Amino acid sequence: MKKNFSAIIAVIFAVGAALYAQTTEQGKQDALFLYNSGRFEEAIKICQKEIEQNPNRVDSYVVMCWSLVRSRQYAEAELRANAGLLVSPYDLRLIEILGEARFYLGKNNGAMEQFQKYIAAAPENGARVGTAYYFMGELYVRKARYLHADIALSAAVRKEPLLERWWVRLGYAREMAKNYRGSLSAYDEALRLNPSSADAQNGRTRVASLLQ
């Protein structure tokens, strides 16, 4: 009888643990689903609850920070990313999103440091490598270091060649560096991707007049 009772208790605990794991995994999926659906505030609330239940749940910090940046809550994103990095100091997702938060806060040196860390550690096919190069390019533009911006933005468009906005910014960096032919080429590519891009058309007109 005691053996049967012990077996029943063991089964109850096993089922409970399985249900808890399933609920936890479902919570992660729900938060990520909400983020991917553009429902950032809802995703943030779910992640907050998950972190309250388990402060070491790194995925919750990641999805929360992504959602905070997308909802333009940059100071909170910086705070949460730093908290997540205390739990997992080498998580590349947190390293990169902290760079984005600092970029939008105008913390140029801190942002650059994060993107450089990410590029140094991420594999060539890392999910955010192109994005990190793009932000580095924008940071160099802010500092009027246009040759460096050209290098970073060129790397960005090699990784993700279908983003018209990135080609426009590459055209602008080259224009400021007085590389007019290279600038014209970048603006032309932006217009090929999006013929209605006013920024690309205006940039191309400026550069073409300088080449005459």
List each language-model region with its residue ranges:
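Alpha-helical segment of the N-proximal tetratricopeptide repeat
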Residues: 25-54, 66, 70, 138
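Canonical positions in the second alpha-helix
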Residues: 49-50, 83-84, 117-118, 122, ...
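Helix-start (N-cap) detector for alpha-helical repeat units in TPR-like alpha-solenoids
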Residues: 23-24, 58-59, 92-93, 126-130, ...
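Canonical tetratricopeptide repeat
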Residues: 63-66, 97, 131, 135, ...
